[in-house]
Regions:
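NTP-dependent nucleotidyl-transfer catalytic core
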Residues: 1-314
Length: 314
C-alpha cells in the first residue's frame, strides 16, 4: 500500500520539476513463493474436483486461491493489464500453466488496487522474463568473467566485500551466495540482471520503493552491478539504483487492529482503504509519515469530518 502512494507522489514531484519520469512496476513472478502459489492453486483445484486432501503448511490459504482455482477449472481466460491473454485448459496438472494463470490473475488484482488509489504505471516488467531471455545467466557469467566470484560449499559466491564503497560509504560485511548447491539463484541475482537491463535502456537514475526487509539487498545488488560492469565495459554509478525503504503499515478499524497475513489469507487491500476512507484521504495518510517510520492507518480518523482529521486542514 505505501509503495504505491510513495512512488506515485515522488514521480509526480520529480515530473513537476522537469525530470523525465517513467513509472515501472516490477513483478516478482518467479522464485519459491510463486512455486508455492501454483501449488496452492493446484491443491484447491483438486479439492474442488472432489479429492480429499489438505493444504500443505507452506501453501497460501486465502479464499482468493479458491477463486483462482474455480476460474481456472471453468476455463475463464485471464488478460493481464499490458499483457497477452492466458487461456485456461482446466488441466490442473499443468504446473507451468497454473503458475502463469495465477500470476496474471493476481497481477490484475494488484493493478485494480493501484488504479483505485490513482496510481498509474508506464511499463510492466516481469521477473520471469529475465530467465526466459537468458538475462540472469548472462549477468552471472559477466560477474564470473570479471573475477568477482568463487566456489565454496557447492555454491557460487559473489565477493561483495571486494567493494569498499557501494555508494555513500556503503559496503557489505561478508560475501554472498549467488547460486545455491541445488542450482537455483538467490533472490538478489535477478535484481542485478533487472537493473543491468534498466541501465541498458538509458536510465541514469532509478529509485526503488521497497520494504525495509530489503535493506540487505542494496549492497548485494550494487556489488553485482559494479562487478558485471567491468566485463560489459560500462560505467554504472555506485549509487545505482537508489532505494526508499518503508515499513509496513498496520490498519486500525473500529478501534481494533486488523490482523493481516498473506499466507493465511487475512489482509486489507488498497481498494478496501479507498472504499473506507476515500481516495484522497487514503493517499494523504499513506504518505503522511516518513517512509521508514512505523505507520498506523486509522480508518475511522481518516473518515472523520472534523479538525481531528489531518485531511480536514487541506
Amino acid at each position: 500500500a505505501r509503495q504505491g502512494a510513495l512512488g506515485d507522489v515522488l514521480a509526480n514531484l520529480l515530473d513537476s520539476q522537469g525530470w523525465k519520469v517513467s513509472r515501472e512496476f516490477y513483478y516478482n513472478d518467479a522464485g519459491v513463493q510463486i512455486g508455492n502459489l501454483a501449488m496452492s492453486v493446484q491443491v484447491r483445484c483438486r479439492q474442488l474436483q472432489g479429492e480429499s486432501l489438505e493444504l500443505p503448511e507452506n501453501a497460501y490459504h486465502g479464499e482468493y486461491i479458491v477463486s483462482i482455482a474455480r476460474d481456472f477449472l471453468d476455463k475463464k481466460p485471464v488478460i493481464p493489464h499490458g499483457g497477452e491473454p492466458i487461456e485456461s485448459t482446466g488441466d490442473y496438472g499443468d504446473t507451468d500453466l497454473i503458475r502463469r494463470y495465477s500470476v496474471a490473475y493476481l497481477r490484475n488484482e494488484q493493478d485494480d488496487d493501484l488504479s483505485a488509489l490513482g496510481v498509474r504505471f508506464d511499463n510492466f516488467f516481469l521477473e520471469s522474463s529475465l530467465y526466459t531471455t537468458g538475462a540472469v545467466q548472462k549477468t552471472v557469467q559477466a560477474i564470473i568473467d570479471a573475477g568477482y566470484t568463487y566456489e565454496a560449499d557447492n555454491a557460487l559466491w559473489l565477493r561483495t566485500t571486494a567493494f569498499e564503497d557501494l555508494g555513500n560509504g556503503l559496503r557489505d560485511d561478508k560475501d554472498r551466495v549467488m547460486k545455491k548447491s541445488d542450482g537455483t539463484y538467490t533472490y538478489f541475482v535477478p535484481d542485478v540482471a533487472y537493473h543491468l537491463n534498466k541501465f541498458s535502456r538509458g536510465y541514469t537514475k532509478a529509485v526503488n520503493i521497497q520494504g525495509t526487509d530489503h535493506h540487505g539487498t542494496i549492497a548485494r545488488v550494487r556489488a553485482g552491478l559494479q562487478a558485471a560492469s567491468k566485463t560489459l565495459g560500462v560505467t554504472i554509478p555506485k549509487t545505482f539504483p537508489e532505494y526508499i525503504l518503508h515499513k509496513m503499515l498496520s490498519v486500525v478499524k473500529g478501534g481494533e487492529v486488523v490482523k493481516m497475513s498473506k499466507r493465511s489469507g487475512n489482509y486489507v487491500t488498497l481498494r478496501d482503504l479507498v472504499d473506507w476512507a476515500g481516495r484522497d484521504a487514503a493517499r494523504f495518510f499513506l504518505v503522511s509519515r516518513k517512509a521508514d517510520a512505523e505507520f498506523v492507518f486509522d480508518v475511522d480518523l481518516a473518515k472523520k469530518n472534523s479538525d481531528e482529521n489531518p485531511v480536514y486542514y487541506l
